[in-house]
């Protein structure tokens, strides 16, 4: 039996029954629904199409609901974006401000409490990198630009060395999880897993709802590697 599975993420260009059928016949084993994008009606249409194809073709293509997880983003920047120069000092703050080369905001209020001197902040999928020089523990973080470039509004912010204290399931994730459970999906993917407790909590929510979906831990942060064996023990897939 083939143990390696092909997981395909479904988007607007691949959500029709005709295209999904071609993908299934080409070897797709798991249909991934990315809850970072798309409305529930879009995901529901894909679910209906996959289940219809399973009936028609006598197959069992699984459905994976991939939860977005906590998303930290930059706030509003000057209209054309700003250029951060290497070795320059920039302030990251939690109070809203129209960002420029010297200061910009983020949407996570506890960050000044979470970060420590020497830790890195990655902006826009790692295109830009900052190093924390100091934090006031309240509203502002002073950083040095390690890798510069253009920065615009609403870009993703990641913290490879920082233990973020925000919950693993956001309010949006809770709503998406309820929808996925209602649709009886086969798998639930949890983003930015940090500990086995994240997976235990997710499984508890699933079982409490009377569902039997299996869980996948997405390993995206170095701190997860510190307890990877425990995470594996509480997961059905990695």
Which residues are covered by each model-predicted region?
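Non-catalytic helical/linker scaffolds that mediate oligomerization, partner binding
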Residues: 1-238
